[in-house]
Amino acid sequence: MLAVHSFSEPGGHRHNEDALRVQAHLLDPDCWLCFVADGQGGQAGGGPAAQVACQSALDAALACQPEALTHPSAWPPILRQADAAVAADAAAGFTTLVGLCVCRNVVVGASTGDSAALLISDGKPHHMTVAQHKNPPVGSGGAAAVPFAAALTEPWRVLVMSDGVWKYVGWERLIEVACRANGPAVIAELQQAARLPGSGRFQDDFTVVALEGA
C-alpha cells in the first residue's frame, strides 16, 4: 500500500516559486510519478519556470509506458523535454527539477539543480540526487539531467524536496526524522525544524513530497 503526503509554502515573500506534481500513471495505478521544481530566485520567471517544468515533465512521463519508466535511461529525455519547454516560454526563467517514479519495487528518476530526493529503505538512507549538476539550470536549453535508481525494501520512504527543506533542516536532522517518523508526522517535524523561531516563517520556499510503502 502506497501513501502520499505533500506540503508547499512560500518563504520570505508572497509568491511560492516552488512547484510539485504527484499522481499515479493513468495506465497503472501502482506506478506513481512525482516532480518537484524550485524556480530560481533573484530574477523574473522563477515561479512560472517551476510550474512549466513540472507540468511538461509530467506530460512526458504520462506519454511513456509504465514499464519504460522503470529504466533510468527513460528519465534524462523527460527532463530535457521540460528544459526545452521552459526555455521556449517567454514568461519563464530558470528552475531546478527532480522527477521520479515509484513502480514495481523500484524508484527511478533523474534530477538537475539542487533540489533533492532521499530514500529510506530497510532503515538505511540513500541520497539519490547526490551526483546531480547544479548548472546549467532547467530553462537554459542545456540542463544536464543525471539519472538514479534504487530497489525498494519495505518499509520504505521517498522524500522529494526543494532546497528550502534540506538547507534549513540539515541533512543529519532530515535523515533522522525520515528514518523515525512516518506519514504526516514526517512533514510536520521537517516544517518545525525549518521555521524561524518567533515568526514561524520559512527562510525559503519549502516544498516536500513523501511517498511511503509498507
Tell what function each PLM region has.
Residues 1-214:
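PP2C/PPM-type serine/threonine phosphatase catalytic domain
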